[in-house]
Amino acid sequence: TPVILVHGYGGNSANFLFMQWRLKWRGWGNVYSVSYTPPHINARKLAQQVNDHVERILASTGAQKAHIVCHSMGGPLTRYALKNLGLAGKVDRVITLGSPHYGSRIAGLFPAQGSAAQMRYQSPFVQELAEGGSCPGGARFFSIYSNLDNFVLPVSTAVLDGAEANINVPYLGHCALLYSNRVLDQVERCLLSPKPEV
């Protein structure tokens, strides 16, 4: 099953170089880091790019489903693609790192347009995304976050309703989540965790 890494606002695929290398070193063979651009356009258009990357990787590998690891805004974009763009049933697990699932107050501190404005706390976009359940598309969801994340405010916005697990890895900043071995250990646990008995 391919593991696809989706960066956050203003980033690119290089943000995941450390995690991509470490996962490969730990034996995960098919790890792909993707980019979407430009960050200031509508989040729905960015989610379409995420959707297209996943579809392309599934087609090239012949896999039926992918695992997706997302940082920051990559989480809401992936959830949108699962809910609205046809990824439902094609993703096994979604693991988010410091994702503002219900928006962040930081995004309201400056004039913003496009996806940045859509990431404001309790914005119409994030409220619409949560309607009918925050974990769409039949995927298993895990949210990893930190109590000291300086971009995801309040911290509770990183706690995803309906997720299989919400995991606090304390004392890490927003970008430090990408480079922490403690986070990497949790990501791997989520990737390996057996499906819960019904």
Residue ranges of predicted features:
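Acidic catalytic loop of the alpha/beta-hydrolase fold
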Residues: 147-152, 174-175
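Catalytic histidine-centered segment of alpha/beta-hydrolase-like enzymes
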Residues: 43, 172-181
